[in-house]
């Protein structure tokens, strides 16, 4: 078995490069790989005096003399040829960086809460769109959006910039076109929209942060947790393309900020905790209930009807979700367009609606006695009505008949029982409440079902004579189903010869 080649010993520059990398990352700078670290650390190494290089020379000698302790020879490697010690060191550093970020967010919110200024805490949300990712891991920018936000004022200010990178990395045109068509739908270079001068873009960003004095201090900006590498790469690319390399951006996770802010507002206004973990904050942001809100995207995406993928719309929607969850805990009334969309209903809208309804109800008058009497009168069951006070007869069968007003006489029952007498009070004003007319030229007989409940009750109240009953028993009825026996003509109850008439039918028989 051939012997495994030993890796080359680490020189003084390697240890200086690792130290330089740690210092830059602690300041918020992110490197894409060791090649970039080597390129950045080289000029600084050349400027070091011999006595400044001595500590690194000693570390290189120690690494060569005792490689196992120094992480040199005899060490295990990953499949990519990376030492396990380096992998573990990077993982430990990431955990340390995450702890520092968490500590920074918690201290920021706790300080504002202790000073009773949680509503005045101003933060910045940022989101970006990109065309493609190069082979070195660099993101080619397409759009950048930043908003200024606080619980009291909601969305205070916004900045939206479309970025034109002019050129794409070699071989990335198809990737850029595919990604653009499936997300933000912005034209790809060389037809891209927006600003191509990166220095001008950076000055707009610094002006938005109110940082024009050359200071390195820039407020922390929050973005979606998984988008931190993308946002960091885009901002770093803008910085590298300009001479304003003194600025250091600090990009923090939005979900962690939302979770800690919600805990602080609950401590202020609630006794019961409703946020058990950070996963609930993530779920609320991922649900994105304001995704299709109109009027919060940039003009280009409004014309494309693709508001969901707009970077400006995205950061505004984050602000709406946080406001909807936290403002009521601290008693902050939400305003349309700042805390919620313009078409949302706020508490003040509900209060105004209730006040208007109460005012309108107070103006209503009670029903007059005359109207009450009209409402209490029974409606006639007949389909022909007459206005007693006029000469007009309103009929649903014969239309309108004009004549002299006459006295309404209730119809008396015939010898065979007759109909019930009309004993109700007549309405002298409304023709639609008139009683049954005793004399009507256009009146036609009404057919009734002899087997109905109404007819049975009539027979009980007005029993038939023995002769008519015997004749009814002799009347044969042919057919199947339900038969209808109408024993009524223009003079009242039917005669014997009418009752004996036989009608043969199929289905439901009718005997007239």
Curated annotation (Swiss-Prot):
- Domain of life of the source: Eukaryota
Instruction: List GO terms (cellular component aspect).
Output: nucleus; P granule
Which residue windows does the record flag with biased composition (Basic and acidic residues)? 379-388, 451-464
The primary gene name is mael
The annotated region (Disordered) lies at 49-72, 360-421, 439-465
Its predominant location is: cytoplasm
Query: Which GO BP terms sit in this record?
Result: cell differentiation; male meiotic nuclear division; negative regulation of DNA-templated transcription; piRNA processing; regulation of miRNA-mediated gene silencing; spermatogenesis
Instruction: Relate the protein's function as given in its record.
Output: Plays a central role during gametogenesis by repressing transposable elements and preventing their mobilization, which is essential for the germline integrity. Probably acts via the piRNA metabolic process, which mediates the repression of transposable elements during meiosis by forming complexes composed of piRNAs and Piwi proteins and governs the repression of transposons.
* Keyword entries, A-Z: Cytoplasm, Developmental protein, Differentiation, DNA-binding, Meiosis, Nucleus, RNA-mediated gene silencing
Q: Which PANTHER family match?
A: PROTEIN MAELSTROM HOMOLOG
Q: Which residues bind DNA?
A: 9-75
Molecular function terms from GO: sequence-specific DNA binding
Family, as annotated: Belongs to the maelstrom family.
Q: Which organism is it from?
A: Culex quinquefasciatus (Southern house mosquito)
Biased composition range(s): Polar residues: 360-370, 393-421, 439-449
Gene3D superfamilies under this entry?
High mobility group box domain
Q: Which PROSITE patterns match?
A: HMG_BOX_2 (PS50118)
Q: Where in the cell is it found?
A: Cytoplasm; Nucleus
Q: What is this protein called?
A: Protein maelstrom homolog
Under the heading InterPro entries, the entry gives:
HMG_box_dom, HMG_box_dom_sf, Maelstrom, Protein_maelstrom
